[in-house]
């Protein structure tokens, strides 16, 4: 994630949402020789038009694009930093409002939109607000989550401002929220202390699988360019996450400091990424964090803790005037609830 000024943000608004999960994978024969089916990844501009109409009272620009199936015919799309204000002929109105942190869009089966934020259109602010201490501004950027029996379980990462420029912010902690799906009101929240104990930014990919919930996060070096993935596992007790344990490379441990990186991921994984189950496999999709950030890769595993293998380059971002307009690309998102299964390798 990164905070950007308005000019940068306007240039890199989500023009496309990549529904990559529909065209990701190839099949493998039993002899371990790949039987490759060439599949073309297509850009999908329809969702941008549906989720971010240029006119109206909703979000017309933003990053994040993290989606969660609300299990009632609606889908939640969570944006990080975002814009409110009309866009006409690809130009943003002068009275557009910039919101730091998070805003939500809910789309129903009819394609109707509901936008969730605090304040009003003249002075909008983040939907889930971070408590302030009067020192430096603090905010939540959205992580990932899931729905179970009418409750949205949601992870949010708290940051604070520590300097100027696009990277003048600092990670503070991971908080776990529960919201009522019908009203989208917060029921309660709980801090995840493991994130501060072992340095893993938990909650940026979450996967319900069999009888457990797997909570993934990256741990980066001091430069932020190199990062590995760690995973925690929890149970639902009275529809609330409890009994957290952490993968140490061989078994699950109650001590969060025993965590170890997941094996087999050859690229530096982006701050936000995707993990989901598909055809009895576990799939991880990530944008390249360092090197060529335009590249989007997938990996597969037989279990949620890996090891992962079968690295595959899915797509390379090819946006017109990318360098000329000083665009940035990061944190690709997959939307498995819209998946049309083809093959997996």
Model-derived segments and their meaning:
Residues 203, 207-302, 316:
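Active-site cradle of extracellular carbohydrate-active enzymes
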């Amino acid at each position: 994630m990164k905070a950007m000024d308005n000019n940068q943000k306007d240039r890199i608004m989500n023009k496309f949402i990549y529904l990559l999960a529909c065209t990701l994978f190839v099949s493998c024969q039993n002899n371990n020789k790949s039987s490759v089916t060439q599949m073309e990844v297509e850009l999908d501009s329809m969702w941008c038009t549906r989720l971010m109409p240029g006119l109206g009272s909703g979000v017309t620009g933003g990053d994040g694009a993290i989606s969660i199936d609300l299990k009632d015919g609606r889908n939640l799309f969570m944006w990080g930093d975002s814009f409110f204000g009309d866009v006409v002929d690809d130009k943003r109105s002068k009275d557009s409002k910039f919101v730091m942190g998070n805003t939500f869009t809910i789309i129903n089966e009819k394609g109707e939109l509901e936008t969730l934020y605090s304040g009003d259109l003249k002075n909008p602010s983040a939907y889930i607000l971070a408590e302030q201490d009067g020192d430096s501004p603090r905010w939540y950027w959205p992580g990932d989550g899931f729905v179970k029996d009418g409750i949205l379980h949601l992870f949010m990462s708290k940051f604070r401002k520590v300097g100027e420029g696009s990277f003048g912010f600092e990670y503070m902690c991971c908080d776990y929220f529960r919201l009522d799906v019908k009203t989208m009101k917060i029921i309660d929240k709980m801090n995840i202390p493991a994130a501060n104990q072992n340095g893993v930014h938990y909650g940026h990919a979450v996967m319900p699988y069999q009888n457990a919930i797997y909570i993934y996060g990256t741990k980066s070096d001091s430069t932020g360019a190199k990062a590995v993935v760690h995973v925690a596992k929890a149970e639902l007790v009275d529809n609330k996450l409890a009994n957290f344990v952490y993968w140490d490379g061989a078994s699950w441990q109650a001590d969060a400091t025993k965590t170890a990186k997941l094996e087999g991921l050859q690229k530096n994984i982006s701050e936000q990424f995707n993990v989901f189950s598909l055809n009895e496999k576990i799939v991880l999709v990530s944008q390249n964090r360092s090197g060529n950030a335009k590249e989007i890769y997938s990996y597969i595993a037989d279990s949620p803790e890996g090891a992962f293998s079968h690295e595959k380059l899915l797509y390379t971002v090819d946006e017109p005037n990318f360098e000329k307009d000083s665009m940035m690309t990061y944190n690709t998102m997959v939307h498995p609830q819209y998946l049309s299964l083809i093959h997996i390798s």
